[in-house]
Amino acid sequence: MSIVRMTDLDLSGKRVLIRQDLNVPIENGRITSEQRITASLPTLKRALEQGAAVMVTSHLGRPKEGVWSEADSLAPVAQRLSELLGREVPLVRDWVDGVEVQPGQLVLLENCRMNVGEGKDDEALSKKYAALCDVFVMDAFGTAHRAQASTHGVIRFAPVAAGGPLLMAELDALAQALDAPAKPLLAIVAGSKVSTKLELLANLVGKVDQLIVGGGIANTFIAAAGYNVGKSLYEPDLLDTAKKIVADAKARGADIPLPVDVVTAKQFMPDAVAEVKAVDAVAEDDLILDIGPQTAAQYAQLIDKAGTVVWNGPVGVFEFEAFSKGTEALARAIASSRAFSIAGGGDTLAAVDKFDIAQQVSYISTGGGAFLEFLEGKTLPAVAALDARGA
């Protein structure tokens, strides 16, 4: 990729517009998780230290275009940024037609999704954004899969368009995991439905050495192998698809190891009685809610031998203590592995937090949908636009 990096630019005296992802959860005016705000600080500080006139914008929630609403205002974010940076961070409400900002100053521009034309990647709005700055910096990987005015259109028209440190760290980590991985490459893909991860599975099966499936996805593969899954969540209409994915893997020498034992219950309840069963001993009224200890040990061995691990999704109902052991075993294996590891997806990050392994994972992707689309082999609009500008 030939993307211009913000870290390679001299921003002194330049007007710099930075698109961040500051879409944080807010309840009753209070920010309940500020991870995205703290993640943005090094980018903002770097621009300020170089003497740039810094404008920052982000989306928050899903406001109606053309209508200001307090519930979707970035006001709490501006206040928290000012506390973290130790300087006043004014919030500018009407900013599309011009912004007053001096070198060494930082202003936060109100929720860009309130601007008419943002969602449709309107060209006129994109040009107005571009006219605000000398340099546009795209640093919001989490929205890189959306072709909108602040994530795509402005890149086409800004005098200079660059990738910010957060975005580039994400792209560098994903490239290391998928484009030139240390072998063997092992992926863990889990979730409730094969249908939501079909493209991901189809793309990864052409790259990986081992593909571990978990959750409802694993149940569909177990059923496709001819085993009874009882009352478990699975997709009977995708059994042939699962068989094809297994055949495609085998054809290129890759492996999709199936569970040899599972943890079952009679009801989907936190206090349900957990019972370990061989995969061929599942009863008609059983629910499969986790992988069994023997399977977890086998998978942990594969992780230990891997050169690269990509993790998307917990392998059991880890929110229920009795059905969290499989996910915990894999999390601990990843934490102690020498492999380059990348973890992403909301439930995966919750598992990383629950088992306190964040420091042992090489890279944690906060990209959500963008992370998934990249794993699916799709071109992200923001990345493609930055690449075109850097060529």
Curated annotation (Swiss-Prot):
Associated pathway: Carbohydrate degradation; glycolysis; pyruvate from D-glyceraldehyde 3-phosphate: step 2/5
Principal subcellular localisation of the protein: cytoplasm
EC number of this enzyme: 2.7.2.3
GO biological process: gluconeogenesis; glycolytic process
Catalytic activity of the protein: (2R)-3-phosphoglycerate + ATP = (2R)-3-phospho-glyceroyl phosphate + ADP
Subunit structure: Monomer.
Record's protein name: Phosphoglycerate kinase
Gene designation per UniProt: pgk
